[in-house]
């Protein structure tokens, strides 16, 4: 059975004080993935190419927000993007609405078993502002993912 996207929530840890930064009013999130490169293993006598799996190459994730200069999380995100700070991100799925992650004593996410999670590291590489007729001002924020995302299913 499929899970609804509505009710999902994006979080990161503010490196200034290791506090939880709740990203307000996310509209969509896409591209949290690493593609597996190919290593060609074809011999000259072969008539079809053959491959083995190579290194994983992290991609660029994006999330869209209705940008609001009155929203502290949006201002802080823009500051962190400008600084090029690598952040740890947590995407809480809709199977545990309203359940934020904890932050442990070492400043890492401590996720709960009552919600599914997708954890990944990355720095924001874009924070453009889009102004169009009959819409809210929004930003499609780019994140260069670093390493392999970790998918943690709900267990309770």
Question: What is the predicted role of each segment?
Answer:
Residues 46, 61, 78-82, 106, ...:
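General N-terminal targeting signals
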Residues 96-151:
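Short beta-strand and beta-hairpin "edge-sheet" elements
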Residues 50-53, 77, 108:
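Beta-strand-rich interaction surfaces with strong enrichment in secreted/lumenal proteins
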Residues 1-69, 121-137, 149:
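Solvent-exposed edge beta-strands and adjacent loop segments
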Residues 39, 53, 90-94, 146, ...:
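Short, surface-exposed, polar/charged, turn-prone segments marking secondary-structure boundaries
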Residues 74-76, 152-156:
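Short, charged, solvent-exposed linker or helix-capping segments at domain edges/interfaces
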Residues 55-103:
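Structured, beta-strand-rich domain cores
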Residues 11-12, 86-94, 108-111:
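Short conserved beta-strand and strand-loop elements enriched in small hydrophobics
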């Amino acid at each position: 059975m499929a899970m609804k996207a509505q009710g999902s929530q994006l979080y990161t840890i503010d490196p200034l004080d290791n506090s939880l930064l709740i990203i307000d009013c996310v509209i969509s999130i896409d591209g949290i993935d690493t593609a597996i490169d190919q290593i060609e293993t074809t011999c000259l006598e072969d008539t079809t190419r053959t491959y083995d799996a190579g290194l994983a190459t992290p991609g660029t994730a994006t999330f869209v927000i209705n940008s609001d200069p009155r929203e502290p999380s949006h201002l802080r995100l823009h500051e962190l993007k400008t600084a090029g700070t690598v952040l740890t991100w947590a995407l809480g799925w809709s199977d545990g609405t309203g359940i934020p992650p904890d932050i442990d004593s070492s400043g890492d996410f401590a996720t709960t078993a009552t919600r599914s999670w997708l954890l990944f590291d990355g720095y924001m590489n874009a924070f453009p502002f889009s102004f169009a007729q009959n819409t809210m001002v929004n930003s499609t924020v780019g994140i260069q993912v670093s390493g392999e995302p970790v998918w943690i299913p709900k267990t309770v």
